[in-house]
């Protein structure tokens, strides 16, 4: 099967890495995967193609904006690939009623915006696939985990970089500010003399974007002055192929997920990617949801507003215990989320 992804490809975004993983494993199962477009010099390992006739399936991967090709390319794709050969992946929960959590994170700002998304999806395909472990809410919806885990990518501690940070967070400030302010910052403030370097790597932690059309300002809302008071470092994002190595430079990595996707029980690549690193992942997730993804051992890695201090300080004091917990989670991921299973699920969904 020849599978062409149509998506906004960015070197510092998880979904580009996820599709790159499929490119790597697809030949083992007799498939070929590429992203629509022309080769980019800064992404040399990504397979690009604009030869639509070479592909028999197309996957439209949507995030938080309706990504459109040029009219000529869009017409070529639709003209060469029948409706039954098109798949939609709804990564950011747009194919849902308007959801607004505590006046903060939301999938749509207005009902009119939601209608535009629904109409666009329905024009392309009969079904909408979602990377969720929640049951479908309607006849057009199909759960498809999509993201997978490859034990071969785990970092060998012997080859890992030196641990120069106590705590690291790798990811953009896109609806993450409240969780960080509520869960992590009080712990750092109370224990600053006991905690070493803390760094946030990603966009918009030091300041929100200034370019027009960046999105709802609430998505970037954050007390950046708190970072200065607590001597927390910031750094621009790294390329997707540097993420695991970067995370391995810290004793602890904090995992956060934007609230609306957590509410919808959507998975993201970071759920799996963080366990490739030589680090202790601590997860700002609902404990039952985490156990459903990672197995029961993950309950020992959960951070809550009330329990974050005890967990973080214990992980710094007893790293070997937490490394054993991480190994339990890795074994669960290898058994239940391997790419052989993921590739089979994707191929089956494209054939159905």
For each feature predicted by the language model, list its residue ranges.
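C-terminal "capping" alpha-helix adjacent to the active site of nucleotide-linked donor transferases
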Residues: 304-321
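A charged, aromatic-enriched C-terminal amphipathic alpha-helix characteristic of glycosyltransferases
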Residues: 316-350
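Nucleotide-sugar donor-binding catalytic core of glycosyltransferases
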Residues: 2-29, 35-47, 62-77, 91-99, ...
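N-terminal Rossmann-like NAD(P) cofactor-binding module of classical short-chain dehydrogenase/reductase
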Residues: 59
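Short amphipathic alpha-helix with an adjacent loop that forms part of the alpha/beta core around
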Residues: 45-53, 78, 314-315
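Short beta-strand/loop segments at the ligand-binding rim of alpha/beta enzyme cores
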Residues: 83-90
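A short acidic/histidine/glycine-rich donor-binding loop in glycosyltransferase catalytic cores
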Residues: 295-303
């Amino acid at each position: 099967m020849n599978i062409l992804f149509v998506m906004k490809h960015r070197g510092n975004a998880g979904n580009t890495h996820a599709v790159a993983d499929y490119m790597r494993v697809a030949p083992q199962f007799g498939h070929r995967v590429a992203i629509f477009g022309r080769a980019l010099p800064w992404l040399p390992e990504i397979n690009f193609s604009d030869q639509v006739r070479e592909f028999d399936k197309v996957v439209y991967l949507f995030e938080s904006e309706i990504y459109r090709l040029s009219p000529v390319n869009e017409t070529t794709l639709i003209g060469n690939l029948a409706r039954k050969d098109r798949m939609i992946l709804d990564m950011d929960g747009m194919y849902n009623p308007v959801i607004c959590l505590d006046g903060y994170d939301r999938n749509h700002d207005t009902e009119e915006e939601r209608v535009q998304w629904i109409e666009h999806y329905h024009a392309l395909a009969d079904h909408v696939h979602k990377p969720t472990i929640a049951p479908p809410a309607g006849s057009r919806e199909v759960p498809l985990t999509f993201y997978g885990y490859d034990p071969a990518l785990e970092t060998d501690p012997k080859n890992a970089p030196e641990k120069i940070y106590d705590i690291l967070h790798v990811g953009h400030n896109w609806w993450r500010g409240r969780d960080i302010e509520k869960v992590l910052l009080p712990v750092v403030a109370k224990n600053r003399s006991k905690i070493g370097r803390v760094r946030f790597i990603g966009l918009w932690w030091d300041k929100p974007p200034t370019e027009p059309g960046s999105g709802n300002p609430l998505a970037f809302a954050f007390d950046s002055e708190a970072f200065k008071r607590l001597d927390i470092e910031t750094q621009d994002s790294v390329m997707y192929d540097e993420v695991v190595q970067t995370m391995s430079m810290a004793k602890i990595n904090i995992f956060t997920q934007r609230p609306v996707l957590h509410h919808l029980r959507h998975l993201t690549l970071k759920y799996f990617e963080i366990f490739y690193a030589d680090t202790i992942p601590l997860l700002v997730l609902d404990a039952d949801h985490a156990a459903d993804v990672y197995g029961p051992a993950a309950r020992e890695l959960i951070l809550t507003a009330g329990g974050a201090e005890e967990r973080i300080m214990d992980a710094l004091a007893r790293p070997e215990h937490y490394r054993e917990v991480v190994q339990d989670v890795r074994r669960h991921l290898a058994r239940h989320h391997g790419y052989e299973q993921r590739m089979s699920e994707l191929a089956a969904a494209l054939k159905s």
